[in-house]
Amino acid sequence: MKQTGAIIFWLMAMTSSHAQDPGFSQFFSSPLTINPALTANINGKWRVISNYRNQWSGPGNPYSTGTISYDRKIFQNVDGNYVDENTRVGIGGMMMYDESTGGALKSNYASFNATANIRLMKKEGYEQNGARIRHIDKANNEEGSEQRLGVGLGLSYGHRRLDLNKLNFGEQFTGTGFDTNLPTGETALSEMKPYLSASAGLVYSYSKNNIHIDLGVATFHINTPNQTFIKDENQYLARRYVIHGNLETFLSDRIILTTNGVYQNQAGASYFSIGGVMGYYLAGNEVVGDVILNAGLWYWSDNAVIPYLGISYGNFQVGLSYDITTSTLNEAAKRANTFELCLILRGRGKASGVIPAPWK
């Protein structure tokens, strides 16, 4: 669907300010966009994640974002144990696309992360179960604990493009309509110079009995690369600062509680999200693994509440969420529908933590 010529002025205004990163309501299902130190923090040997977000579905489909990522542990034995449990090493990569204005403005990203997770302290009596599922050896874990620190570094490549074929300009107006075959005179706007961006993060982890906690901080775009359709060195991609945390615990032999939250700040804009999910163990065996039903709810700043429903079947997981808008944005959009779909596939192996979280 062709847009009106006024769209170009909106695009110019948008790129004249510091651009912001696309994000997901299911931030917990997109760990590589939250903290590079979360790379290879997996309940398994490796992990593939695919996220899709469609915001305000309807005529023109204003916003659409998708990712696919792969991360894994390295320097492991055949059984999935690290050669050196005192230092765990992992790598990962991600590709992302983001479209807005009915697909006229397109952004593509690729990133690579590396992480090292170092044991700070291990109290005798603590023994990691190694399974992704609910079973705990209380005799070994009752008095034990472990503390670890993860350090992650990342490098990303970004490129934005304006598809002029999906826009109409004043030069194309014939008096009775728009002739898209006519020149626009705006070819200089179609391409933005690619950029490289650096990121870094830390994650502190604490495990004891049937409780696991992660606390992390990260900074993206440390080098603040230039990003604009016009030649203006003052327009750059602002640093994004992230603080996040999560807690997992067993409430019973069949019920797992996971809570988490995130705070992000970029270019003077900040937002937070907090919530949790309850997992119910349905069934499982050595062949197919565990079947766990997950249901939860998150609160996103003053903008939306986000119900979530998912299921884990062995090493495969699917999660679906829907943003229920609570702000005045709901009045501005005729169909303020925003949904996200996440698919996760894990390779069997030793878990990074004692307790299964639905996104690890």
Residue locations for each model-derived region?
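Sec-dependent N-terminal signal peptides
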Residues: 4-15
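Absolute protein N-terminus
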Residues: 1, 19-20
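Subset of outer-membrane beta-barrel
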Residues: 20-360
